[in-house]
Amino acid sequence: MRLNVNPTRMELTRLKKQLTTATRGHKLLKDKQDELMRQFILLIRKNNELRQAIEKETQTAMKDFVLAKSTVEEAFIDELLALPAENVSISVVEKNIMSVKVPLMNFQYDETLNETPLEYGYLHSNAELDRSIDGFTQLLPKLLKLAEVEKTCQLMAEEIEKTRRRVNALEYMTIPQLEETIYYIKMKLEENERAEVTRLIKVKNMGTEE
């Protein structure tokens, strides 16, 4: 469907410039879409690897915890879980991936505190409980990393969809409209030129007959 414009040379020049810009924009957006897809696939793989590793470590820590509960007094476990484990600091900054602002989470334990994550007596403890607590402690930064990657995947997917719509709009609407309109104006101008030539010939012939 062509645009509703006057078939003039000025309009033809303007539309040709628009077509050049639209074609260049389409290529840039298509390149961006391809690169976004490439990075998105890498992130999905990373997300799956992280999730599998976390699930495996969680199962191991839970297994140790269940074993520990069977050999340690329940009151001690309840008291232990009620204790504040450790102070941590989490900062979130933004980084730019192909014009997409994604979160970058930084996790850090408070080094001013005791190096032992949980302060509890070893009288009622056992190896399974120690491993379980250590395992859950090490999971926190990995869980934050997983959250970071999953949020990045979500934002990248939204940008890919947005870019895809823009690429399709240019490819299937804007560029074809411009090309059809340019063709129409060219045909109209050629038609006008032929009509003008025919008119001049007739005028010349009329002058000759006189």
Swiss-Prot record:
Coiled-coil ranges per UniProt: none
**Taxon lineage:** Bacteria, Bacillati, Bacillota, Bacilli, Lactobacillales
Record keywords: Ion transport, Sodium, Sodium transport, Transport
Instruction: Provide a Gene Ontology MF annotation, just one.
Output: proton-transporting ATP synthase activity, rotational mechanism
Q: Which HAMAP family match?
A: ATP_synth_D_arch
The task this protein performs is described as:
Involved in ATP-driven sodium extrusion.
BP GO annotations: proton motive force-driven plasma membrane ATP synthesis; sodium ion transport
Q: Which gene encodes it?
A: ntpD
Indicate what this protein is called per its UniProt record. V-type sodium ATPase subunit D
Q: Which family does it belong to?
A: Belongs to the V-ATPase D subunit family.
Query: Organism source for this protein?
Result: Enterococcus hirae (strain ATCC 9790 / DSM 20160 / JCM 8729 / LMG 6399 / NBRC 3181 / NCIMB 6459 / NCDO 1258 / NCTC 12367 / WDCM 00089 / R)
